[in-house]
Amino acid sequence: MREAHPIERAVGMAYYASDSDGTGGRLRDSPADFRVRELEAFDTQPADAPTGDYPWLVVRATLHEWDTNDFARELANTVGMSRERVRWAGTKDRHAVTTQLFAVRDLDAAQVPEIRNADIEVVGRAGRGLEFGDLAGNAFEIVVRDPDAPERAAAVADELAAFGGGTVGTPNYFGQQRFGSKRPVTHEVGLAILRDDWEAAAMAYLGAPTEHEPADSQRAREYVAETRDWTGALAEFPQRLRYERTMLHELADGGSFRDAVETFPSNLQQLFVHAAQSYVFNRIVSERMARGLPFGEPVAGDVVWFADSDADAAVAQPDAARQQRVTDSRVDVMARHCERGRAFVTAPLVGTDTEFADGDPGEITRGVLDDLGLSRADFDLPGEFDSAGSRRAILLRPDLTVSHDPLAFEFALPSGSYATVVLREFLKPSPLAL
């Protein structure tokens, strides 16, 4: 089994599913080389629907090199409202051309602004704002420039088909972006919050410099880690590090470490604990690989969720209302359901209400939590940090097409899954190149 890059191992992604060398090559030579389009699953009314019943205006934005949070802030600032009144279903990467929905509360269609590098069209109105996961999935069109050995893609695909039980499959890891591409610390903040160590949470975000960020950022983080001089640190931190500067202002004004962490927008506060859950999930998936347990079919003790019958097969998601704990007598039956795409083997996104699997799968989860010094009760947290938990499929089966000249990948993934998790298998690059 091929070990992953150390940066990936630091976020729980310990292995590749394929042993073959990758194609190499470069991603995102230009934003147009990495296109992402939401597969929408959100009901709207006509744009002239009464605003009393439908206070949210829904727009579709095609963004060129915009981070989702930054665009939402720019949209809110341009129309003179709080960023908290802008909602979306999924966060997209800056270095791409992305098309996604945004919902804006109490905005008229005539007030939609023009924003640089963004094409915005009105879709309609809705009675509620978008929430995270309010989409069927995402469609990707990705071009790889100057691959070293594009012919290797075929061997990788064959190995992934063996891993996936006949069709190309990869571990459904949370990708590097979940934790921070160049500075993966969001899970460290989340783990500190779970341990009720707000000082460690704040300092994980403010300090902890990495060699992969600009030199002025590194110096600022080193300064604040060494001195705890909040006012002095404001003179060191570049203006572009907005969240850090807001935290420093709070600390300089006498606020607590928890107060500083709670200066983040509510969606980012949730992201910290979600990143910790994601790290635990990745560790569980990696340990399952290390033990040689299958991904495309269950073993006794697994918790299997049936597929959402309303979803397109390419982006089908597990349905929480239809699940089964696999006994020895049901392994073969459930394996057939999984093989046909009717069900998924799952692992937990641990929270207060998580029920552990039995047998080896349950032992793996308990072992990971014990190693991290965590329990389900630790997820019973105040405000935006609380999480009841859920489950997630451990196998990702992209509907994949590979073409050459140029080397390109086209596929669709369900909501919450990562294109880079597929691409890392084919390219075998440094995570920083993804």
Curated annotation (Swiss-Prot):
SUPFAM superfamilies: Pseudouridine synthase. PROSITE patterns: TRUD (PS50984), UPF0024 (PS01268). InterPro entries: PsdUridine_synth_cat_dom_sf, PsdUridine_synth_TruD, PsdUridine_synth_TruD_CS, PsdUridine_synth_TruD_insert, TruD_catalytic. The keyword Isomerase applies. Residues 169-396 form the TRUD domain. Its EC number is 5.4.99.27. It comes from the Archaea. HAMAP family: TruD. Could be responsible for synthesis of pseudouridine from uracil-13 in transfer RNAs. This is Probable tRNA pseudouridine synthase D. It comes from Halobacterium salinarum (strain ATCC 700922 / JCM 11081 / NRC-1). The gene is truD.
